[in-house]
Amino acid sequence: MDARGGLSFAESEGHVPFAVERVFWLYNLSGCHSRGGHSHGHCAQVVVAVHGAFDLLLDDGTTRTTIHLDSPHRGVLIAPTVWDELKNFEEGTVVMVMASHHFDAEDYISDYNEYRGELVELRPYSPTLATEWDAFVDKAKNGTFLYKRGYMDYHADRFTDCSLMFYKRGELIGQIPASWNKEHRTVTSHGGLTYGGILLSEGATTVDTLNMMHSAAAWFSHHYGAKEWIYKTLPYIYHSVPSEEDLYALFRMEAQLVGRSVASAISCDRHIPMRTLRKRCVAKSRKSNLIYEESSAWDDFWPLLKKVLKSRHDTTPVHSISEIKLLASRFPENIRLFVARHDGNIVAGAVVYETEMVAHTQYLAVSDEGTQHCALDGLIVYLAEERYADKPYVDLGTSMEPGTSLLNEGLIFQKEGFGARAVVYDTYLIKLG
């Protein structure tokens, strides 16, 4: 304010947290009891009292608050899915509204009872909800046993759980497994899992998923002071029905793709023919009197696995022998060991994580003797064509150089020789706050 009058301004980078698509004004409000009285499904708005003053009521379904606006230098952000009402206008009040979307009549909910019915309620997970959590995993359209508390919590000492559950009209419709790193102020979905995308009920809609993802981001930011949310998506081959609503939500939240690992999966319904070299190896394995069987000989296989991973990839198993035995005892129908034996000795093995849609080889290893007999080739074909022929996919795992985004071309060449083709495991970064 100076002798020339007053000036207020707003810049998209520093003051308005979205690209402004529409601006409108409210004026001549004398005698008007209220304006607004609705919520938007997708549109965000910033409201400013350009002249005069008024009260802004905001209701997010859990908290109702009233803010008095009386300055052109201060605005209030109205997030999507928040109910708003403008009232108690002073004489001569002028209101400016900046919106993130063009006008869309279908984006409005103008009946408060309907609004309450459409709300998604967020509840933080606690151990008392473990039974309900696990029951939802079983019926979710994209659930796997890795989301069960018996799997997620086996290393609870290493991860601070901050998982969330979402309800609509009292019914559980979504869950987000998540862990909190206080030092880095980062939430990860989930720090102890290969993937950790949102679990959805069959009835959950795309709009529901948008609301859940936005609510989760706001909760992580407000409750923990989190600055980042690392989100590891669940590959589509694990979905019992299409479940990529979260990918659209990530796009809307301007999430950044920061990691992509390439796995190789065999389609058991539509086999791509094996390459000639793999066919020769499989033929050789069939002449070597190998026996393929499910086994409980974890203590015999684990030293072989550790030796192979160290010598060929300079790495170690993610699980210790005690951890994998504990998990296999908790999930005997899902975590299985298959071996190839020659003269009674284990010469190759595969630890399989079995889900409804996928048999995933969590670990593969072959001894020097097994290599001579092409035992691992024979074991993979046994899994894909016999043991798991009724599964849509056999996932042979990723082929990345440890700790990098670089492809191990030799390893993926071997897997593709069986007719396996690429499935990606993606990681996104969502900026919070």
Where are the predicted features?
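Non-catalytic, conserved peripheral segments adjacent to functional cores
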Residues: 1-76, 91-94, 98-119
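A short, internal acetyl-CoA/4′-phosphopantetheine-binding micro-motif in the GNAT/acyltransferase core
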Residues: 77, 194-206, 364-373, 400-402
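Conserved active-site tyrosine of GNAT-family acetyltransferases
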Residues: 78, 250, 415
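Short, high-confidence coil segments that cap the C-terminus of an alpha-helix
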Residues: 91-93, 159-161, 223-226, 335, ...
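A conserved beta-strand-loop-helix scaffold within acyl/acetyltransferase catalytic domains
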Residues: 122-185, 233-370
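Aromatic (often tryptophan-rich) hydrophobic motifs at membrane interfaces
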Residues: 167, 176-178, 212-215, 334-433
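Conserved acyl-donor/pantetheine-binding loop and adjacent beta-alpha core of acyl/acetyltransferases
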Residues: 180-197
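A gly/proline- and charged-residue-enriched helix-loop-helix capping module
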Residues: 193-240
